[in-house]
Amino acid sequence: HKLQERYDLLLEDLPIIKPYQDKDSYSALHLYPIKIQVNKVKNTKKEIFEALRKNGISVSVHYIPVHTQPYYENIGFKKGCYPNAESYYQRSISIPLYFGLTLEQQDKVIESLKQVLQ
């Protein structure tokens, strides 16, 4: 949880919404998804994602709305059916958080985010 707490502290001033963590519960914290405040940044999510990847940061996408998958589109689901799921997807990426992530690696993630979001 030290890495998560460090992200919480060091990402404080960035135009993102950090994951909610209930103080009375315990989580495995296998992901650290952030929501980009797209109205406060100049780059698109795709540009941010690609810039981070180019800088060697293993960002991921979580979660693609199920109703936009080909199977569900073939049985009648359409984009716009679940606007909250689509909005979350359009603004969210997961930054590295895993056992073995070093402070130096985490610093690189943080610095890369600061560069691409400001």
Regions found by a protein language model. Give the residues of each.
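PLP-dependent aminotransferase class I/II
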Residues: 1-118
